[in-house]
Design a protein with these regions (language model features):
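C-terminal lobe/hinge of AMP-binding adenylation domains
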Residues: 31-32
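Acidic, metal-coordinating catalytic segment for phosphate/diphosphate chemistry
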Residues: 1-16
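Short, acidic, Ser/Thr-enriched surface-loop or helix-capping motifs
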Residues: 21
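Charged phosphate-binding loop/patch that engages nucleotide di/tri-phosphates or the phosphate backbone
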Residues: 126-148
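Unchanged
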Residues: 42-129
């Protein structure tokens, strides 16, 4: 019996952020009917931290995003064409000065980008992709926010 990996398996690497503004609100995006955190796939020649900052800035129309620290990694699989994609996403705590206006990257299917009060993040994380709860908990462990 052949134990080689299936030719229909695609392995992807991505990075994203739990981004706080000066009001300690968290940046969330609404994409394909779900709340999500900004993230995206690693491009050739860039580091994982560079990818995280680039994706946050591109998806939300920001500049000057500061990477603070690594938070966690999440892994999930999903169908992609006639294959199965397994994506590892590297998450980072990030900060941005002020409370900048956001411009969602509509070409990526992002309909909204919003600063969400931290008190509402636990609810949001519980209504969307299960891996986002892991990111939320890692952010709280890192001291990114205080939850009552």
């Amino acid at each position: 019996m052949d134990n080689a990996p299936s030719a229909n398996l695609i392995v992807l690497t991505a990075a994203g952020g739990w981004v706080l503004n000066e009001a300690n609100e968290v940046l969330w995006i609404h994409r394909m009917g779900q709340w999500d955190l900004p993230k995206g796939k690693l491009e050739a020649g860039e580091s994982i931290p560079e990818c995280a900052v680039r994706e946050v800035e591109e998806e939300c129309g920001l500049t000057g995003v500061e990477l603070v620290s690594a938070l966690c990694e999440t892994v999930h699989s999903y169908p992609l064409d006639d294959a199965t994609a397994t994506k590892t996403t590297h998450w980072f705590l990030m900060r941005v000065a002020g409370t900048p206006a956001l411009t969602p990257q509509k070409s990526e299917g992002i309909s909204r980008a919003e600063w969400i009060p931290q008190d509402d993040c636990h609810f949001l994380a519980g209504t969307t992709y299960t891996t986002l709860r892991e990111v939320e908990e890692a952010a709280y462990r890192a001291g990114a926010s205080q939850r009552d």
